[in-house]
Every structure is written in C-alpha cells, then in structure tokens.
C-alpha cells in the first residue's frame, strides 16, 4: 500500500540515516504500518537515547514489541485506546501496550520540553517540519495524526499543515468551545492520504474525541481496502 515506488523499508532506512546525521529522534513502532502518529516531543533525547533509538528501530524484532504499561504515560495509554478503537480490537496483553504493531510514532520537536521552553525550541521545530516535508518515509503513510497541538498549524496567514503534507483542509470535528477538536485534511490529487490535526494526547483527551477520530480513520482505511 505504498504510495511511492520504493519499498517502505528502504524509505525507513533513509529516514533513520537522516535522523542519525541530524542527531534527531526517529521514533518507534511499526514503520510498515498504515498509521503515523506525530506527537510534540520525546521525554529523553540525550545523545545516548538517540543512538539507542536508532538501534532499536533497526531491530525488526524489537521495534514493535509490546511495552510494559507505565501508568504515568497518559500519551501512550491514549494511543493504545485510539488504535484499539480503529481496529475494533482488544490487546492480548493485560500488563503491556501493543499499539505499536499498528502505528509508527515520532515527535515534531527534537528538544525535550523539560530542557527548554517552546520559544527556544521553535527554530528546531520549524527545521523538523521541513525535514518531514522532504521525507518520503513520513509522506508515505495512509493516515498521519498530528497530535501536537500548536506546534504546527493552519490559519489565515500560515498553512503549515497543507504545505508540509501536500493536503487541503477538509472538515472540523467537535464544537468550537471544546478543547477536544480535530481537523481532517486530504490530498485531493491522491486521496489515499488522510492527515488529522489535534491536540497533544498527554492529558485532557475525551473518550468521545478518541471514538470519533477512530471512526473517521477506520472509514478511510476501509475505503482503501486496508482493513
């Protein structure tokens, strides 16, 4: 189901090499999945963590292996719930998360929030947006979820989402008074790619938002014959 001619693994290897050269976080999960989730930032992007991250991504046995549940990690708990809703499934594990079988996750910032504030991280975020725009691996996913709030935006002056992912705004979901909203975008020349922009998943995510978003994604994947 690759949009490009190149094999997804080859696209992924190039992405890993680029991240290594740029000394940036690459991510984790299944690079051959149909869904990409882009969050705000990782909690640990020390040089040692970056090296370890790339090594784990190159290990096919490890990269989408179930992870022990961490009750403090609300982001992953919400990712798990979303993926379970999309695929109408329940994890086979009680004490582990296994959503990474069904998605690859990465971050829009290469600067952990604990180390610097958003203003100082903004230049690196802008550079990473350009990197993602030029990455065939990032662009190859059928569903891209931008769970990073105001780190990237579309407004009257700036169309970062449109320009980065070659899409156009489609529809807004949720009331304007609610913090639980999301926006869909489609590549009209190649409608196989759906881009969803929403808030960070770390806290305050409603069950209704997860269910509605899952329904939209599931319908898109069904149209493509992917589920």
Short names for language-model regions:
Residues 1-75, 128-135, 181-189, 222-227:
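Active-site and ligand/interface coordination hotspots across diverse enzymes
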Residues 65-96:
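Acidic, metal/cofactor-coordinating or nucleic-acid-engaging core segments within structured domains
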Residues 37, 145, 195-197:
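Structural motif
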Residues 61-75, 109-126, 200:
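Surface-exposed cleft-lining segments at the edges of enzyme active sites
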Residues 41-45, 109-113, 149-154, 200-204:
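Short, solvent-exposed loop/turn segments at secondary-structure junctions
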Residues 133-150:
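Proline-aspartate-enriched helix->loop->beta-strand connector
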Residues 1-16, 120-133, 155-227:
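C-terminal capping/extension of enzyme domains
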Residues 95-113:
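Short, contiguous, well-structured surface segments enriched in hydrophobic/aromatic residues
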């Amino acid at each position: 189901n690759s949009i490009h001619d190149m094999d997804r693994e080859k696209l992924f290897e190039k992405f890993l090499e680029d991240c290594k050269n740029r000394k940036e976080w690459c991510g984790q999960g299944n690079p051959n999945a149909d869904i990409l989730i882009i969050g705000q930032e990782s909690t640990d992007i020390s040089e040692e963590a970056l090296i370890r991250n790339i090594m784990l991504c190159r290990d096919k046995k490890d990269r989408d292996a179930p992870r022990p549940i961490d009750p403090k990690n609300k982001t992953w708990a919400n990712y798990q719930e979303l993926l379970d809703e999309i695929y109408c499934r329940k994890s086979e594990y009680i004490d582990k998360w296994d959503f990474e079988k069904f998605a690859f996750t990465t971050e829009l910032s290469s600067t952990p929030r604990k180390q610097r504030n958003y203003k100082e991280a903004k230049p690196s975020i802008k550079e990473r947006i350009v990197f993602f725009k030029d990455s065939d691996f990032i662009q190859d996913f059928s569903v891209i979820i931008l769970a990073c709030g105001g780190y990237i935006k579309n407004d009257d002056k700036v169309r970062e989402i449109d320009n980065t992912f070659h899409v156009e705004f489609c529809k807004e979901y949720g009331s304007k008074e609610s913090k639980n909203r999301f926006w869909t975008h489609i590549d009209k020349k190649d409608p196989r790619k759906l881009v969803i922009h929403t808030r960070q998943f770390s806290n305050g995510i409603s069950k209704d938002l997860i269910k509605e978003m899952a329904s939209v994604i599931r319908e898109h994947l069904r149209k493509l014959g992917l589920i």
